């Protein structure tokens, strides 16, 4: 079976078992800052397992795209060198949220794997593990399914602590957890390795293909396991692994999904060895990089973009090892789209964008190699001893993308070595950070848990009545909040908008007779709206009725800005292109901030075009229309989804100007575009590689901004004794006068340096056929001394020059050696000695070097080193 057929068969099997087929979620986890990338099928259902979210179904099945790069499940450096490590993979899964449990999950797995209608794997090839004390699962396997005891393995706590086992899964130190049962395929005695639990289990003979996790306990901070009222099931089967089994190969790189990618990679690079580990690296990395970019990640120096950049550069480095010349990586995207574009349409839709991002990053990598060389030169100039420290090697590798083997080559040329152990310690520290980032990072038992949903009244107005259904103080549920206490109030219905989609939460107050609660912010937990604030008067009790009043002026100002972001988004796609994707936003009552994907600064004429388009839509004063519909219908209408937002089965579609702007949005907006009044961009800049940010104001704030700019123009005109009408002419004349004076100053400096050079050259002494000049020139900076050394080298011919001086209490040193002497004498070595004499450091090229220090009293001694340096070197 082909991989695509296996994927479809799995999903169809579980649909027939009453499961809802759910699309793969984005690789960027929605509203979950604790997780770097989606790395398991259960990630999108996390809130369902935690009891924070209720869905219309209790059974689900997915084929989830996953990335594991550097986290606890994967080491990036292993990819390409083992049969099964990948940065990107598909996880097939079936899930039960308080519906079926162990018996059904086990029978489903066995039926799909061994049923003649499905995968039809030989039963005698399958081994099963269970947690050591999970007698229930063991009995189901042996007594009901019929797996013989000799192919059953109980796995205990094999990781040094209670419940620390390959067969016990936990969401964190506390919270949902439970035993798991894993199914292994035996590739046969021709492959080395032993069954699970044996000393040889790390071999390739017995391969895990399916894991069923049974979440049946809630572990509290004291380590006690409490049975969950509604146990759940989370399963995962790697598509690549099961494809290898069904296609009778022992390496994932031999399956159909990879064969065309390996061929395309070899063609793009121009190499013939299609079994080289480096080629497998490239074929693997094009998948993770392309899917990450399609889901909105762009290369940068932090967070998700940083991981993407590392993967791209690793692919480029391995391509270069195979002989690639110029950019090649982006050329493989077409083959990936042909292989996986039908299953994941976002690849087809984003193909041009993905190729452009990869090509730009490849070109940038070539430049960073040059930057890395410069940084290495600086570090070598300060090096004491013959070993380059591990932290320096790691900095070059991690920050500048500088290959470790290249650092090693340079070190060898200079008779140096690198601290490999220190580098590995830095790498392990990074892996620990990645492992930490892959955990959920929260105490399940400290979460504010609210059953049910809050009915939102805010689309109809800014006030309404509600009943208190829950109160919280310091995250703990309470029956009452007293005057002066801070806490959270949950109502059965509310006009307060809860922060989401970039729009801040509403503020205002809740009141009843003799009671007032000042609402400072409103957030959401599951479907409940949480009103954060303080009891200003009286006390609040669960069950009490209150009147909820939103600050209308703040709500209206926020609505202007939110509606303007929709118009701006549409205008950006018109002016810059369809590759523009929203990367984030902040909308409050003061301004709007909109982050989006684009690869260069926006030109002034483009900014003007954006303002013109948005303001034209405002002047059209069209009605802002909303419609409740299902997600598929909304997408069919071309509605754009908000970056990082989770949507239910029913969504709210917001349209402006007919089809000018159509987006999914649950925020609060104006009634007509004319309500916005005026739109003015206040700034545009870059916030990360490939991500730009526009900030703008609307309505009264836009008018105030323009009035302020007018006042600044008047003040500037007054400073140059002009008016608004002739301000540009006045400024132009002033700048021209300044340039003229700067030119005169440079000419005077050049004359002074030339005169000084004539005087100094006469002071040079001859040592073994070389002119040696050491001189003190106080008050000159490094730039002036460099120019003077260049001039003296031309005047003296075969020469060694060391100039130094005191400037602002510090020592400045410059050394120069003419090219005909650099084979015997190096300026960098002379500088190291001279700088050390004044308590500093220095270094540079063989023909020119700079340095400095703090001990000006030793400057004359440092300059005297020049003659001894030449005498010893020649």
Swiss-Prot record:
Signal peptide: none annotated. GO terms for cellular component: cytosol. Pfam families: DHHA1, tRNA-synt_2c, tRNA_SAD. Its cofactor is Zn(2+). Binds 1 zinc ion per subunit. PROSITE patterns: AA_TRNA_LIGASE_II_ALA. Zn(2+) binds at residues 562, 566, 665, 669. Gene3D superfamilies: 2.40.30.130, 3.10.310.40, 3.30.54.20, 6.10.250.550, Bira Bifunctional Protein, Domain 2 (3.30.930.10), Threonyl-trna Synthetase, Chain A, domain 2 (3.30.980.10). It is found in: Cytoplasm. Keywords: Aminoacyl-tRNA synthetase, ATP-binding, Cytoplasm, Ligase, Metal-binding, Nucleotide-binding, Protein biosynthesis, RNA-binding, tRNA-binding, Zinc. GO terms for molecular function: alanine-tRNA ligase activity; aminoacyl-tRNA deacylase activity; ATP binding; tRNA binding; zinc ion binding. Its EC number is 6.1.1.7. One of its GO terms (biological process) is alanyl-tRNA aminoacylation. It catalyses: tRNA(Ala) + L-alanine + ATP = L-alanyl-tRNA(Ala) + AMP + diphosphate. The keyword Metal-binding applies. HAMAP family: Ala_tRNA_synth_B (MF_00036_B). Catalyzes the attachment of alanine to tRNA(Ala) in a two-step reaction: alanine is first activated by ATP to form Ala-AMP and then transferred to the acceptor end of tRNA(Ala). Also edits incorrectly charged Ser-tRNA(Ala) and Gly-tRNA(Ala) via its editing domain. Belongs to the class-II aminoacyl-tRNA synthetase family. Consists of three domains; the N-terminal catalytic domain, the editing domain and the C-terminal C-Ala domain. The editing domain removes incorrectly charged amino acids, while the C-Ala domain, along with tRNA(Ala), serves as a bridge to cooperatively bring together the editing and aminoacylation centers thus stimulating deacylation of misacylated tRNAs. This is Alanine--tRNA ligase. It comes from Pseudomonas paraeruginosa (strain DSM 24068 / PA7). The gene is alaS.
């Amino acid at each position: 079976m082909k991989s695509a057929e296996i994927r479809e068969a799995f999903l169809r099997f579980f649909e027939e078992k009453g499961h809802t087929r759910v699309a793969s979620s984005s690789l960027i986890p929605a509203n979950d800052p604790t997780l770097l990338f989606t790395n398991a099928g259960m990630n999108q259902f996390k809130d369902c397992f935690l009891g924070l979210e209720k869905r219309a179904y209790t059974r689900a099945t997915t084929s989830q795209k996953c990335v594991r790069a550097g986290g606890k499940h994967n080491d990036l450096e292993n990819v390409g060198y083992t049969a099964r490590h990948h940065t990107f993979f598909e996880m097939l899964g079936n899930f039960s949220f308080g519906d079926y449990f162990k018996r059904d999950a086990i029978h489903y797995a066995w039926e799909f794997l061994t049923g003649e209608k499905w995968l039809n794997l030989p039963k005698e090839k399958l081994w099963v593990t269970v947690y050591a004390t999970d007698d229930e699962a063991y009995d189901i396997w042996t007594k009901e399914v019929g797996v013989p005891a000799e192919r059953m393995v109980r796995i205990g706590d094999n990781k040094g602590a209670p419940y620390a086992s390959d067969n016990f899964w936990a969401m964190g130190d506390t919270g949902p957890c439970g035993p798991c049962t894993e199914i292994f395929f035996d590739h046969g005695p021709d492959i080395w390795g032993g069954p699970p639990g044996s000393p040889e289990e790390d071999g390739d003979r017995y391969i895990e293909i399916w894991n069923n996790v049974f979440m049946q306990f809630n572990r509290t901070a004291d380590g006690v396991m409490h049975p969950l009222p509604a146990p759940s099931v989370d399963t995962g089967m790697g598509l690549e692994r099961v494809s290898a089994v069904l296609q009778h190969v022992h390496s994932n790189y031999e399956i159909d999904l990879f064969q065309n990618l390996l061929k395309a990679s070899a063609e793009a690079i121009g190499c013939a060895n299609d079994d080289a580990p480096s080629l497998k690296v490239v074929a693997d990395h094009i998948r993770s990089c392309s899917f990450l970019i399609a889901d909105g990640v762009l290369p940068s120096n932090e967070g998700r973009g940083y991981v993407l950049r590392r993967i791209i550069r690793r692919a480029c480095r391995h391509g270069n090892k195979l002989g690639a010349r110029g950019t090649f990586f982006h050329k493989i995207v077409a083959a990936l789209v042909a292989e996986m574009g039908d299953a994941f349409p976002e690849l087809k839709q984003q193909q041009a964008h993905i190729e452009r991002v990869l090509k730009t990053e490849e070109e940038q990598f070539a430049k960073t190699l040059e930057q890395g060389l410069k940084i290495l030169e600086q570090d070598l100039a300060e090096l004491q001893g013959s070993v380059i420290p591990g932290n320096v090697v790691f900095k070059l590798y991690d920050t500048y993308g500088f290959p470790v083997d290249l650092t090693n080559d340079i070190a060898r040329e200079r008779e140096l070595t690198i601290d490999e152990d220190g580098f590995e310690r830095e790498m392990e520290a990074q892996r620990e950070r990645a492992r930490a980032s892959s955990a959920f990072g929260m105490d399940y038992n400290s979460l504010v848990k609210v059953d049910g949903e809050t009915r939102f009244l805010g689309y109809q107005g800014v006030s309404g009545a509600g009943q208190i259904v829950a109160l919280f103080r310091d995250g703990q549920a309470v029956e009452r909040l007293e005057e002066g206490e801070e806490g959270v109030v949950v109502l059965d219905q509310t006009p307060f908008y809860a922060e989401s989609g970039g729009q801040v939460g509403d503020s205002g107050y809740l009141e009843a007779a003799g009671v007032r609660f000042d609402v400072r912010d409103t957030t959401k937990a599951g479907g409940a709206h949480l009103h954060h604030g303080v009891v200003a008067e009286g006390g609040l009790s669960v069950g009490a009725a209150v009147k909820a009043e939103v600050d209308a002026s703040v709500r209206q100002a926020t609505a202007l800005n939110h509606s303007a972001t929709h118009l701006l988004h549409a205008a950006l796609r018109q002016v810059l292109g369809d590759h523009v994707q929203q990367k984030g936003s902040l909308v409050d009552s003061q301004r709007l901030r909109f982050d989006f994907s684009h690869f260069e600064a926006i030109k002034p004429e483009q900014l003007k075009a954006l303002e013109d388009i948005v303001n034209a839509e405002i002047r059209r004063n069209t009605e802002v229309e909303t419609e409740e519909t299902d997600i598929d219908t909304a997408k069919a209408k071309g509605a754009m989804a908000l970056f990082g937002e989770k949507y239910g089965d029913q969504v709210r579609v917001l349209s402006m100007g007919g089809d000018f702007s159509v987006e999914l949005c649950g925020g609060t907006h104006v009634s007509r575009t004319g309500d916005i009044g005026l739109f003015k961009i206040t700034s545009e800049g870059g916030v990360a590689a490939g991500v730009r940010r526009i900030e703008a104001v609307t309505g009264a704030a836009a008018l105030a901004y323009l009035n302020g700019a007018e006042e600044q123009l008047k003040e500037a005109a007054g400073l140059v004794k002009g008016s608004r009408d002739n301000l540009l002419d006045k400024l132009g004349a002033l700048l021209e006068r300044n340039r003229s004076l700067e030119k005169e100053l440079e000419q005077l400096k050049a004359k002074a340096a030339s005169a000084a050079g004539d005087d100094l050259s006469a002071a040079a002494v001859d040592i073994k056929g070389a002119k040696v000049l050491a001189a003190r020139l106080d008050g000159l900076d490094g730039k002036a001394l460099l120019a003077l050394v260049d001039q003296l080298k031309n005047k003296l011919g075969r020469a060694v020059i060391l100039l130094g001086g005191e400037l602002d209490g510090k020592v400045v040193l410059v050394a120069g050696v003419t090219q005909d002497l650099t084979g015997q004498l190096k300026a960098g070595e002379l500088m190291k000695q001279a700088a050390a004499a004044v308590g500093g450091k220095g270094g540079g090229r063989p023909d020119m070097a700079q340095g400095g220090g703090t001990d000006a009293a030793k400057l004359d001694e440092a300059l005297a080193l020049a003659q001894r340096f030449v005498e010893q070197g020649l």
